[in-house]
Design a protein with these regions (language model features):
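Glycine-rich phosphate- or other oxyanion-binding loops that anchor nucleotides, phosphorylated ligands
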Residues: 1-93, 98, 105-130
């Protein structure tokens, strides 16, 4: 990953998520009885919750969901020439959408509650990809 002639640090992200893998992932969720939605995911670096102003800006940009991961991992995987599909679990409402402060404990609780469903979707997906 050096700098110089032929440097390929700038990865084409036009089709960051492989259409066939996306379809398999959505079909796997449906087969597992888990509701999934497609949408525009915007990344803000953490480890901090977004501000209400950032959430308003994300909405203007067309975001359906906001998170602190997924995008950097996708860029790295695409740089390595890998096909990518992503599954993100929304664990809290964005800042300014509900009253009160956001808390990491809430995200951990929601993630723990949904863990079995996520495992089922991933297991079904991997079986379909084998």
């Amino acid at each position: 990953f050096g700098i110089g002639p032929g440097d390929s640090r700038f990865v084409d992200m036009v089709d960051a998520y492989d259409p066939m893998l996306r379809r398999k992932l959505l079909d796997s969720a449906k087969a597992a009885g888990v509701v999934c939605h497609e949408g525009v995911y915007i990344f803000f670096s953490g480890p901090s919750f977004e501000t209400p102003a950032e959430i308003r800006a994300a909405r203007v940009l067309g975001a359906d969901a906001v998170g602190m991961s997924t995008a950097p991992e996708t860029i790295l995987a695409r740089h390595a020439g890998l096909k990518v599909a992503a599954l993100s679990l929304m664990t809290n409402y964005a800042a300014g959408l509900v009253p009160g402060a956001l808390a990491h404990e809430q995200t951990l609780s929601v993630a723990a509650t949904a863990a079995d469903k996520v495992r089922l979707v991933l297991r079904t997906f991997l079986e379909r990809c084998a």
